[in-house]
């Protein structure tokens, strides 16, 4: 077996390219060779990056040109009682973050939720989207394509589902802009986040569209999907899981545990999360849902770039018979429990903490459960931060924790 130093020398000499090393050595040796190259060129020490706790081959489907692994501290909040459509009972929530005080805040929210009897969560809509863009001659041809698509949905569905053992084409929504036609296909991808599944299936469908109509495919993705970008269509129509969590907290719990009142939290939420967000033209009508989404995404192997869509959340707060009702509705939470980063050993353990690693029974139930847990974690984070702001304790809490 070729050693790392020899491989590094061959790259320097132009005999090998950086991405070809795994063909000449095991994945760990290839990663070591790349570290040697980077260290020699940059003067940096990659000792910590190279000190990772799983075989490099376990990451081969998740990364190219691997040199090692970063390590983000992971903690747990809870346990928190969850009454979900796909999850029930007390759950510890795994969060990986470098933001001090985040875990403490979410943990406080979980404790208060438990004092109120737990949170309720439900996935209300599910579907991964891909929206190719076609070129047509004019608006008359665009109308013809839209009509053809509606009349031939069964044929499109058959073509899509021939590419997958698990996915299902749910519907297609056309959008026309001049001589551009966007067809937004929505799929049930079960326990997979499903972007790859949706892309492969949509490619097959596009072949049928081009063969049977005058339309020409310009791009498999026309940005109406819309993936990894702030987009109102995701906030309104949803993408991935649309999930809501809520809790009703007795007045005495709010006053004794959160040191504020239901009225103060409700007013703050309206003026900050609703009016303030509207004035800022924000798509996120919440305090910091992205914090919890990002931390749980990292801990469970989700696509971290899709935190963009996960921040499409609305937090509501109102007084109900003297108690405080709080909800968080996340419109486009793109999660999976199979495929992608969920296969990495550390991230798989994060899913194990929640009891949702791998495919669920029935299919899709594990990803639904993960979405519900993230929604409850977000609810805990919102409740804690809003209360800290209402009681004017935010800065003192950070100071006490040395953050």
From Swiss-Prot:
It comes from Haloferax volcanii (strain ATCC 29605 / DSM 3757 / JCM 8879 / NBRC 14742 / NCIMB 2012 / VKM B-1768 / DS2) (Halobacterium volcanii). Pathway: Metabolic intermediate biosynthesis; (R)-mevalonate biosynthesis; (R)-mevalonate from acetyl-CoA: step 3/3. GO terms for molecular function: hydroxymethylglutaryl-CoA reductase (NADPH) activity. It catalyses: (R)-mevalonate + 2 NADP(+) + CoA = (3S)-3-hydroxy-3-methylglutaryl-CoA + 2 NADPH + 2 H(+). One of its GO terms (biological process) is isoprenoid biosynthetic process. Catalyzes the NADPH-dependent reductive deacylation of (S)-3-hydroxy-3-methylglutaryl-CoA (HMG-CoA) to (R)-mevalonate. Functions in the mevalonate (MVA) pathway leading to isopentenyl diphosphate (IPP), a key precursor for the biosynthesis of isoprenoid compounds such as archaeal membrane lipids. Is also able to catalyze the reduction of mevaldehyde to mevalonate and the oxidative acylation of mevaldehyde to HMG-CoA. Belongs to the HMG-CoA reductase family. CDD domains: HMG-CoA_reductase_classI. Keywords: Isoprene biosynthesis, Lipid biosynthesis, Lipid metabolism, NADP, Oxidoreductase. It holds the Pfam family HMG-CoA_red. This is 3-hydroxy-3-methylglutaryl-coenzyme A reductase. InterPro entries: HMG_CoA_Rdtase, HMG_CoA_Rdtase_cat_sf, HMG_CoA_Rdtase_CS, HMG_CoA_Rdtase_eu_arc, HMG_CoA_Rdtase_NAD(P)-bd_sf, HMG_CoA_Rdtase_sub-bd_dom_sf. Optimum pH is 7.3 for the reductive deacylation of HMG-CoA (in the presence of 3 M KCl). Induction: Up-regulated during growth at high salinity. Is competitively inhibited by (R)-HMG-CoA and lovastatin (formerly called mevinolin). The active site is at 99 (charge relay system), 303 (charge relay system), 398 (proton donor). Its EC number is 1.1.1.34.
């Amino acid at each position: 077996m070729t050693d790392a130093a020899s491989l590094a020398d061959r790259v320097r000499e132009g005999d090998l390219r950086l991405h070809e090393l795994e063909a000449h050595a095991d994945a760990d040796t290839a990663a070591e060779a790349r570290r040697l190259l980077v260290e020699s060129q940059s003067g940096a020490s990659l000792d910590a990056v190279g000190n990772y706790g799983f075989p490099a081959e376990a990451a081969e489907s998740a990364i190219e040109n691997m040199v090692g692994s970063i390590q983000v501290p992971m903690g747990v909040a809870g346990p928190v009682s969850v009454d979900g459509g796909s999850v029930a009972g007390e759950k510890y929530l795994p969060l990986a973050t470098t933001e001090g005080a985040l875990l403490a805040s979410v943990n406080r929210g979980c404790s208060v939720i438990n004092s109120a009897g737990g949170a309720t969560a439900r996935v209300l809509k599910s579907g991964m989207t891909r929206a190719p863009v076609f070129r047509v001659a004019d608006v008359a041809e665009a109308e013809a394509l839209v009509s053809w698509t509606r009349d031939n949905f069964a044929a499109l569905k058959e073509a899509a589902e021939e590419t997958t053992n698990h996915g299902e084409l749910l519907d297609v929504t056309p959008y026309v802009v001049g001589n551009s036609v966007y067809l937004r296909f929505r799929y049930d991808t079960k326990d997979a986040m499903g972007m790859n599944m949706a892309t492969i299936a949509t490619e097959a469908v596009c072949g049928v569209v081009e063969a049977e109509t005058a339309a020409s495919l310009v791009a498999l993705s026309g940005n109406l999907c819309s993936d990894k970008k702030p987009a109102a269509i995701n906030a309104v129509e949803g993408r991935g899981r649309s999930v809501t969590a809520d809790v009703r907290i007795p007045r005495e719990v709010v006053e004794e545990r959160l040191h504020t009142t239901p009225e103060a939290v409700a007013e703050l939420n309206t003026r900050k999360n609703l009016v303030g967000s509207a004035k800022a033209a924000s798509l996120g009508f919440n305090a910091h849902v992205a914090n919890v989404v990002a931390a749980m995404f990292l801990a469970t192997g989700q696509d971290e770039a899709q935190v963009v869509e996960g921040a499409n959340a609305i937090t509501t707060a109102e007084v109900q018979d003297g108690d405080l009702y709080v909800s968080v509705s996340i419109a486009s939470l793109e999660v999976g429990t199979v495929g992608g980063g969920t296969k990495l050993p550390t991230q798989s353990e994060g899913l194990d903490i929640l009891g949702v690693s791998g495919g669920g029974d029935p299919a899709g139930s594990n990803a639904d459960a993960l979405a519900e847990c993230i929604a409850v974690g977000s609810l805990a984070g919102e409740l804690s931060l809003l209360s800290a702001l209402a009681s004017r304790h935010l800065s003192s809490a950070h100071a006490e924790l040395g953050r």
